[in-house]
């Protein structure tokens, strides 16, 4: 039986273009997409070109994502049933209609958010000789980075590198994290875990369940994964995407986006 990599290789060895070979060359450099950008390319490599590029319409870009204020949950009045029930109803409505919402007054300091974004940026932009020790396709590792997790098995690859940090289940030795962003990753994860538990409680109640159901009864908070995506400047951005249309595999994704933007939501 042929492996996924062998099948991909056979599918693309035609017309003088060996797609598998080009993917392999990219992978073996351990420099990711950042390495291509640093080389000063004027043309997008063929392996990144997406023939059926699907982007959102301008109408979709003008839609208003639901915004939910969690501020009252962190104060004494948050214990009142009317205040909490109002938030629960907003969460329920947002999930039914969008599957996505923005939270404000979530109690995570802006300093932590800014430093986490900067930490991810520092990791990807540090000296290659230091960074390459983390490059891997071994998904059993708790911490690694690469370009496109499914590089050899997908028909469309993205202009993106990713730092992967699996903090739970099981304790992670902080020394496994890159030193250049270690402290802020630990601090950020502590804050995000607390926010995640709050959201699971609200989602449980929005479903008409006990507040602790999603967390304690069925263990939706057992796994914690941080993905630090990095999108280098692209020579021909109209021909590819940083992230294709997809559905996340986790129960809840907490997204931290920088000032560049570009996120599209399909309701």
Language model regions located:
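Peripheral, non-catalytic segments flanking oxidoreductase cores
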Residues: 1-267
